[in-house]
A protein has these predicted regions:
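N-terminal Rossmann NAD(P)H-binding glycine-rich loop of SDR-like oxidoreductase domains
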Residues: 1-33
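Short, structured coil/loop segments at alpha-helix boundaries
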Residues: 15-19, 39, 43, 63, ...
């Protein structure tokens, strides 16, 4: 079950799972949603949810570009992930280093910082093979 109780919120979402969340949040009165994703080919799909599409790459774009999008927002939902594409190096780059980039971008926001909601997953079929960056902290 999904529950969202902030009013007059300006939300920001990151990556795949965000399509469903963008639809849910965009349907709420007084809520504006911005969705960040890396592939411009998804712009129409994102816009169809009611969210404002922004194309940025966790792998390639600098932290400051994310900060500029986060300015004035109340909440950042981080749900990005490599999704098993590109092997362990890409998973580390997106899932771990990408999360750090978002944390750093939020820290650079002037004034009130947006809250962060981190959506994460791990392969529970075999918990003994967790990526090192999931358990190393």
């Amino acid at each position: 079950m999904f529950s969202h109780c902030w009013t007059n919120a300006e939300e920001i979402l990151l990556e795949q799972i965000s399509l469903r969340l963008a639809r849910l949040l965009s349907a709420r009165a007084n809520t504006r949603v911005t969705s960040i994703f890396r592939d411009a080919q998804h712009s129409a799909e994102v816009a169809a949810t009611g969210a404002s599409p922004v194309v940025l790459s966790l792998e390639d774009d600098p932290t400051e570009k994310f900060t500029s999008v986060f300015e004035g927002k109340e909440v950042v939902y981080f749900s990005a992930g490599a999704g098993g594409k590109g092997g362990p190096e890409r998973t580390t780059k997106v899932d771990y280093e990408g999360a750090l980039k978002v944390f750093d971008a939020i820290e650079l926001v002037k004034g009130t910082k947006p809250r962060l909601i981190l959506v994460s997953a791990i392969d529970v079929r075999d918990r003994s093979i967790a990526p090192p960056h999931y358990v190393g902290a």
